Amino acid sequence: MVLSRLAASGLLLLALLALSVDGKPVQQWAQSWPGPNIPQLLVQQWAQGGWPRPGPEIPPLTVQQWAQNWPHPQIPPLTVQQWAQGRPPGPPIPPLTVQQWAQARPPHPPIPPAPLQKWAPVQKWAPVQKWAPVQKWAPLLQPT
């Protein structure tokens, strides 16, 4: 969705940059095209009124012809619409049993509360290891 809008705005920006304010192309060589002469499209010729247009004649849509005069018999309204304003066809539906006992007592015994959690006993940690005292070494011999 965002990409399509971004692409559309980019194409619009390119189209606006290609035309100047007066509607003529910005490029100077647009009046004298340096390439070969390209004839106008046939679609543009007959779209401006050059009838008959090329190709076989396309008849008007049949949907447009019979949309005003529907060829099929009249479709009756839905039965849902008929009984939605009054009583529905068929026997009445009793209320749900859940609604019946939800206002009174439930049909089963109450659920007992969960037992309290018993915590594990506190573990005593091992005593902290005491390090051996720092050993004193003999002084280093000095060269004489």
From Swiss-Prot:
One MF annotation (Gene Ontology) recorded for this entry: toxin activity
Gene Ontology BP annotations: blood vessel diameter maintenance; regulation of blood pressure
Region entry Disordered, spans: 81-110
Signal peptide residues on this chain, from the entry's feature table: 1-23
UniProt tissue specificity: Expressed by venom gland.
Propeptide: 24-30, 41-47, 61-67, 78-84, 96-102, 114-116, 122, 128-144
Pyrrolidone carboxylic acid sites (modified residues): 31, 48, 68, 85, 103, 117, 123
Any Gene Ontology CC annotation: extracellular region
Sequence similarity: In the N-terminal section; belongs to the bradykinin-potentiating peptide family.
Protein name: Bradykinin-potentiating and C-type natriuretic peptides isoform 2
Organism: Bothrops jararacussu (Jararacussu)
